[in-house]
Amino acid sequence: MSRVGKLPITIPEGVKIGLNDLEVKISGPKGELSKTFKGNIAISLVENKLLVKPLAANKNARAMWGTARSIISNMVTGVKEGFKLKLEINGVGYRAMVKGKYLNLMLAKSHNTKIEIPSDIKIEMPKQNIIILEGTDKEKLGQFASIIIKQRPPEPYKGKGIKFENQFIPRKEGKKN
């Protein structure tokens, strides 16, 4: 039995839920999200609480049970409060800036890297080396953050690169002569 899946999802004030078979539409003060689930699960709304249950006892249905519950819970949190990710850019001459709908990264390459910003993600830059990403969809936010980090992942010798705010980078010793 799934420990995550059996927990009900409480619907906060100001959040509306629309159920259509395995399609869930959630709208709130921060926006609207929808997702269609596949698999052997049933989603029901009972007294301002969402319940997810497996329709079969096989391994796939049990796996989807907890996953679907977590995704729906993140959707509810996203439309109510939103999600924030903070990225740090470390390195001499490494910086970023927003130009229109593009994030321009200067990361000691022969060219600047331009990344198109998805329409549902907002970027704030208090400094040139700090990027704050905000959005309602936790999955898309993490995906976009990983695309940014992939441009220059942190290296273990000097710690240069792009990383999450409190991410620990294990350091290595340099060459000894």
Swiss-Prot record:
GO terms for biological process: cytoplasmic translation. GO terms for cellular component: ribonucleoprotein complex; ribosome. It holds the Pfam family Ribosomal_L6. The keyword rRNA-binding applies. InterPro entries: Ribosomal_uL6-like, Ribosomal_uL6-like_a/b-dom_sf, Ribosomal_uL6_a/b-dom, Ribosomal_uL6_bac-type, Ribosomal_uL6_CS. Keywords: Ribonucleoprotein, Ribosomal protein, RNA-binding, rRNA-binding. Transmembrane segments: none annotated. GO terms for molecular function: rRNA binding; structural constituent of ribosome. PANTHER family: 60S/50S RIBOSOMAL PROTEIN L6/L9 (PTHR11655), LARGE RIBOSOMAL SUBUNIT PROTEIN UL6M (PTHR11655:SF14). This protein binds to the 23S rRNA, and is important in its secondary structure. It is located near the subunit interface in the base of the L7/L12 stalk, and near the tRNA binding site of the peptidyltransferase center. This is Large ribosomal subunit protein uL6. The gene is rplF.
